[in-house]
Structure formats: structure tokens, C-alpha cells
Amino acid sequence: MSSPFSVPSLIMEEEGRFEAEVAEVEAWWGTDRFRLTKRPYTARDVALLRGTLRQSYASGDMAKKLWRTLRAHQANGTASRTFGALDPVQVAMMAKHLDTVYVSGWQCSSTHTSTNEPGPDLADYPYDTVPNKVEHLFFAQLYHDRKQREARMSMSRAERAHEPYVDYLKPIIADGDTGFGGATATVKLCKLFVERGAAGVHLEDQSSVTKKCGHMAGKVLVAVSEHVNRLVAARLQFDIMGVETVLVARTDAVAATLIQTNVDARDHQFILGATNPRLRNRSLAAVLSDAMSAGKNGRELQAIEDEWLATAQLKTFSDCVRDAIASLNATDADKQRKLQEWSAATSHDKCVPLEQARDIAAGLGVTSLFWDWDLPRTREGFYRFRGSVAAAVVRGRAFAPHADVLWMETSSPNIAECTAFAEGVRAASPGAMLAYNLSPSFNWDASGMTDADMSEFIPRVARLGYVWQFITLAGFHADALVTDTFARDFARRGMLAYVERIQREERSNGVETLQHQKWSGANFYDRVLKTVQGGISSTAAMGKGVTEEQFKGSWTGPGSESSSHVLAKSRM
């Protein structure tokens, strides 16, 4: 007879540590930070996926700071306003005036990919492109923070009292595009973002294969359930790493015209179908295939597709039923009653599946209705989709339990759309925080707004709950504008153009890059050298002979100001 198994003490200790970690994760999830967060997995699942060596991440601290910032804005009815930072100079300048930083995939795609190959925003660059830019900017933030500390702690208390402190460590929110593939790709992307310094990440509900800039045509959505899986994958990775990275869920449902699949019932009400029975058994894909076999191409194929779509009379199933009710042989009062019953039974928030909708229609006397969502599918197999704010609301409600902030991409700065989305989402998720893209793709001057309207736009939208508002590409446009106008003037007027447009403007506005050696940290590394060499260095960069001494005096030329006045401005 075998003796009973004795569990070694090391095994018991291992299990004890594991169970303690499970309890720790459960307690963490029970904090106010995750009060609104839903997870389809357990704390034990997270602990099983962690290693034994606990790591900490600077981005974790920045994520907590970002969360506090956004919640404060939510409580105050205000918004964090920011824009896409292009480089370390911009991120350092932004720190003086803004409380968050954005890193745009569009800007990275056009200016800073991992392969150095520029292009439009199709998310076809290597997936470490945006994380690399995050690290580029985060390292700059850390450096300027160190540099400032050395400078301030080398001053007297009286000097520090007159020198404004700049918080260079502003939380970075980064563009995660569509997650760059399946769940494992999203997990690895989010891990990179945490390691590189991102405090927040946004993921959008477009197909990763056909991803487009939110202001381009041809956008293809994934099913609601697929994007929920992306958000869950991101949250799981953040949980594994023990960070509170802010997760932003973006939907492109307002302007999307296609969707990958009809598998999710929440999408059914927005999918378009052919209503012309003459096209029965003549799908668009088959017609185009036959035309290509006959040698048609280019404009001829486009003309064939346009004609087919016009003949098909595409409608949502709900619109098709409404038209059928209007055509019934019944009194106007009876028709109105049936329309009201249909609207009540199939409202957007109910997300009624197609088969159930057919049963409801039949109960109202609408039978033998021809409506086919497969006939108009594209050659790639995509379904036709009617984008709308209502579709965005349905998706926002589905994403809310899995994300911290919700973002509806729009095609214009439309207060009515902002209001409808905010009210629709917050009816189901009252505590939801919202984001808004103050896009440079909008022609703001053609929006019908006055200058006063534009000035008030951010505060007005903030009062609706949009706590984070950002101009995605302002860094790009500012860089282009300054460079183009200066280059043109420099070609014409030479050094006077530089002095007037750059040097004097830096001086009069107190921009510290006027003394670029100091700004870049020459004094900081002189301190390093002197520390290494016992307090002295004959090769100090800012020693006797440095040309920046010229900027410490007074100027009497045109456009000049005294150094004391410049210093005062720099401290404002």
C-alpha cells in the first residue's frame, strides 16, 4: 500500500504566492478606477498569465495621472484640449500650456515610420511605428523633466520662486489603429505601448485589412463583437502588466459604408439589402465577375456597378417594412398604428435580429417581402452598411463596459451629432467619458460657424461630456506652415527673414529655444562632466567662448527688447 503524498513546502509556498496575487488583482479591480469596467475573465486568469518577476512601468504612473485629469474635467464640465505632437520640440512646448499629448498614426505614417517609408494613413506601416514615436516623445519628456530639476535645484529659493515650474510629464494618448490584426497582435501592440510610455491607447472598429483614415472614403467596419474582443484583449494585456492604461474605443460607424460580416445581430438594422425582385439570383459580385470575364475594366466596371446599385433600390430592412406598410390596402389610421408598432418593436436600442424583425413584420401584415442583403455584397464579400449616428450610439453602448472613453468619428463639426451621441450613449452608461476629434480634415471656415462659435466649440462640446478633445494633425500642419512661409521669405530676404520671423519672435514671446544650447541640455551635461571630474571641467560646453553669451545682454536693434523684459515674458 502506497504512502500518502506529502506536499513539499515549496509547492505550498508557490500556491500561497499565487493565491495572494489573485486576491490582490481582485482588490485592485474593486477600486473606483474600475467601477464601470466589465471583464469576461477572472483575476485568476490574469495571474496565470503573469510571470513571477513583477515589473513596474513609468507609463503606469502616467496612466493614473491621465485618469485623474479626465475625471476632473468630467466633474467640471471642461475638457483636456491637445493636438498631435510631431517631435520632441513640440512636446516640450506643449507642456507649458496643455495637460495631455496625442500621438497620431496619420502623422507617424507620413513622417516617421519604422521603415522610414512615408505614406497615407492606411495603417500599413510596421506595428511598432506609433509605439516608437511614443517612446521618442516620452524620452524627451523625461529628459526635459530631469534638465529642469537640475536647473531649479541649482537656484536659490528666491530664484526658484520667480521661475515658473513646468510639468513636462503630460500623459500621452496614442493611436492604436485597429489593433493590427487578431487578438494576439492587439495584445502585443498594447504591451509595446505600455513599455514605450503611453498613458492611453485608442482602438477603432474598422477592419485591419482595409483600414482608412477616419476622413477617407471606403471604410469597412468589423462586427460589434469583434471590436469588443479587441478591447477585451487590450484590457487583458494591461491587467497582466498591472497598469491602468486608459482605453479609448473609437467607432467609425457614422461614415462607414461597408461591414465585414452580418454575424452580429446588433449590426443587422444598419445593413442594406436589395429590394428589387428583378435582381433575384443576379448578385452584384456575379455581374461584375461576368463583366470582367468579358474584358470589361475600369470605368466600364464602375458604370455597371453604379447601374446595378441604382436598380437594386438598396434599403435597410426597417425602411423596406415601412414602405410596405405605407402600401398596404388599409386606412390611414391603421397604417399609422402599424408604423408606430413597428417603430416601437424595432427601435435602434433593441437591436432586433433580422429573423425576429421578419416575424414582427409578418404580424403587422407585411408578408412575402423581398429584401436580400447578400445580393449587393461587394466583390470582396463586404455587406453594404448605412452609417449614422444611431449606428455609432449602438456601438458606443456595446463598447462602454470595456473601454474608459468613447470616441465617435464624424465628418464635420456638428453639435447636433455630438449631442445625439452623448445622449444616446449616456442613457445606457451615465458615467461614460467621451472624446472628440477636432479634425483638421474639416473645413472649419465652411462649417457655417462664426469666429465666436469656433471659439466656444470646445467648451460647448465639453459640457456634453466630451472630456478629451484633440486636433489630430495640428503638429503636422504647424510644422508645414512655419517651414513653408519661412523658407519662402528666407529665399527672398536672407538673414533678415530669419531674424524677423524667428529670432525676434522667440525673444519677444519668451520661447526658450532662443538659447538652443541651454534648451538642449548643455548645462545639464556640464553638470554630469563636473560631477565625474570632481567639480571642474575644462571642456564644459557652456564655458567661456559659448556664443549664447550674446543673448544675455541687451539689444538695441529694430524689434529688440531688453533681456529683463524677455525674461519676464518667459516666466509668464
Swiss-Prot record:
Matching entries from PROSITE patterns are given as: ISOCITRATE_LYASE
Region feature Disordered, mapped onto this chain: 550-572
Which parts of the sequence bind Mg(2+)? D175
Q: What is its EC number?
A: 4.1.3.1
| Cofactor list | Mg(2+)
Locate the motif Microbody targeting signal.
570-572
Q: Which Pfam families match?
A: ICL
Q: GO CC: one term?
A: glyoxysome
Keyword Metal-binding annotated:
yes
- Assigned protein family: Belongs to the isocitrate lyase/PEP mutase superfamily. Isocitrate lyase family.
The job of this chain, per UniProt, is described as: Involved in storage lipid mobilization during the growth of higher plant seedling.
Q: What is this protein called?
A: Isocitrate lyase
